[in-house]
Amino acid sequence: MSHSVKIYDTCIGCTQCVRACPLDVLEMVPWDGCKAGQIAASPRTEDCVGCKRCETACPTDFLSIRVYLGAETTRSMGLAY
């Protein structure tokens, strides 16, 4: 299953998304673009299951991190309705 995790420059470096991820897909890396001096990164997207807990945990109202589900997941979710 392939999902895409996008981190945007509105990240405030709070680490909430990293702590919310049950599979350690995310990590913080140095970045001078915010006061915290760090930004979330997603080096292990192949482990992402698309639970979107990182999105829910983000205090910037989904403006900093988004999980785009792969087509296979989107199709199977449609069958549930």
UniProtKB/Swiss-Prot annotation:
GO terms for biological process: photosynthetic electron transport in photosystem I. The keyword Iron-sulfur applies. It comes from the Bacteria. Binds 2 [4Fe-4S] clusters. Cluster 2 is most probably the spectroscopically characterized electron acceptor FA and cluster 1 is most probably FB. It is an enzyme of class 1 (oxidoreductase). Pfam families: Fer4_7. Its EC number is 1.97.1.12. GO terms for cellular component: photosystem I; plasma membrane-derived thylakoid membrane. It is a peripheral membrane protein. Its main location: membrane. Changing residue 27 to R: Decreases assembly onto PSI cores in vitro, FA and FB seem to assemble normally. Residues 2-31, 39-68 form the 4Fe-4S ferredoxin-type domain. [4Fe-4S] cluster 2 binds at residues 21, 48, 51, 54. Keywords: 4Fe-4S, Electron transport, Iron, Iron-sulfur, Membrane, Metal-binding, Oxidoreductase, Photosynthesis, Photosystem I, Repeat, Thylakoid, Transport. Coiled coil: none annotated. [4Fe-4S] cluster 1 binds at residues 11, 14, 17, 58. Changing residue 9 to R: Decreases assembly onto PSI cores in vitro, FA and FB seems to assemble normally. It is found in: Cellular thylakoid membrane. InterPro entries: 4Fe4S_Fe-S-bd (IPR017896), 4Fe4S_Fe_S_CS (IPR017900), PSI_iron-sulfur_center (IPR050157), PSI_PsaC (IPR017491). PROSITE patterns: 4FE4S_FER_1, 4FE4S_FER_2. The cyanobacterial PSI reaction center is composed of one copy each of PsaA,B,C,D,E,F,I,J,K,L,M and X, and forms trimeric complexes. HAMAP family: PSI_PsaC (MF_01303). This is Photosystem I iron-sulfur center. The gene is psaC.
